[in-house]
């Protein structure tokens, strides 16, 4: 499936409110910006395993933040746009990624699978502010132990929505 890009998913005034709120929330350090620090390692590609900070809104289907109410309306705009209901939210998080001083020596940040223990889900990526780089979407990953590098799992189950700041 080709990622779907939706420009201006949320109204500008709502986007501004979310941006203003971001830096009032508690963010927590992570030594790896992938799904978790134990995610599958990538081999043969020059990638950056960058640090970051995140704030969990929903984890394993449960509300994990007192601020979820502020971000939940994004799903209403999404449902209206794609003309499908959002039935379940497995995980929602806010992420702050920093420019690594050696970023020009790398092609992209560490590849990862958003929810490696789940099947048949969609991913929403919403940028609330300007990003200095591209988002790379991969449709498969490889196991380092496979000599041929054949595909282990197809992860092309995502729809990507980009909010133009």
Model-predicted regions and their roles:
Residues 1-86:
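Non-heme Fe(II)/2-oxoglutarate
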Residues 65-165:
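Catalytic core of non-heme Fe(II) oxygenases with the double-stranded beta-helix
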């Amino acid at each position: 499936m080709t990622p779907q890009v939706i420009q201006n998913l949320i109204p500008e005034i709502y986007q501004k409110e979310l941006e203003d709120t971001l830096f009032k929330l508690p963010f927590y350090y992570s030594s790896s910006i992938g799904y978790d620090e134990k995610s599958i390692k990538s081999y043969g590609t020059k990638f950056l395993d960058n640090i970051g900070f995140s704030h969990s809104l929903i984890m394993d289907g449960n509300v994990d933040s007192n601020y979820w109410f502020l971000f939940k309306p994004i799903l209403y705009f999404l449902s209206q746009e794609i003309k499908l209901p959002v039935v379940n939210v497995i995980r929602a998080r806010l992420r702050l990624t920093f420019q690594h001083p050696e970023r020009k020596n790398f092609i992209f940040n560490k590849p990862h699978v958003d929810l490696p223990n789940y099947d048949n889900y969609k991913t929403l990526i919403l940028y609330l502010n300007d990003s200095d780089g591209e988002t790379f979407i991969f449709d498969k990953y490889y196991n380092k132990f496979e000599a041929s590098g054949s595909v282990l799992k197809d992860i092309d189950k995502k729809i990507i929505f980009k909010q133009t700041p």
